[in-house]
Amino acid sequence: MKVGIVVFPGSNCDRDIFHVLTDVFDLEAEYFWHEKHLPSKIDAIILPGGFSYGDRLRAGVIAAHSPIISDVKSMAKKGVPVLGICNGFQILVESGLLPGVLLKNTTMNFMCKWINLIVQNNNTPFTNKLKQGQKIS
């Protein structure tokens, strides 16, 4: 399995992702700069976290218009799994690959607290070991 790691100006933890994929899961991984195109022989795509373009306008909005995103969209439509971590998730929302919008919190202050997640869909390569409705904390 070959995983493409998409890198933007301001991305971080892309090396951590590479390490986990190659050294822990023994998968093949390759970095792809946001101005390039993805080869057709990619089995999964990961958009790492960070602060793409310094989050100058909105988190992920500039990166969502990078040339590589059209490849990510077309590959996702063909069933290639795509994972967005932190800013990568924001890029997926801003690009329209995920539904919804990103909103500022009501206090307009930084918030750091633990939250619980509820598994809504366990029919994905990333959630298939979890149970529908399972609480992740």
Stretches found by the model and what they are:
Residues 87:
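A structural signal for conserved, well-ordered secondary-structure elements
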Residues 124-137:
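Catalytic core of tubulin tyrosine ligase-like
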Residues 1-84, 92-114, 118, 131-134:
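N-terminal beta1-alpha1 cap of cysteine-dependent amidohydrolase-like domains
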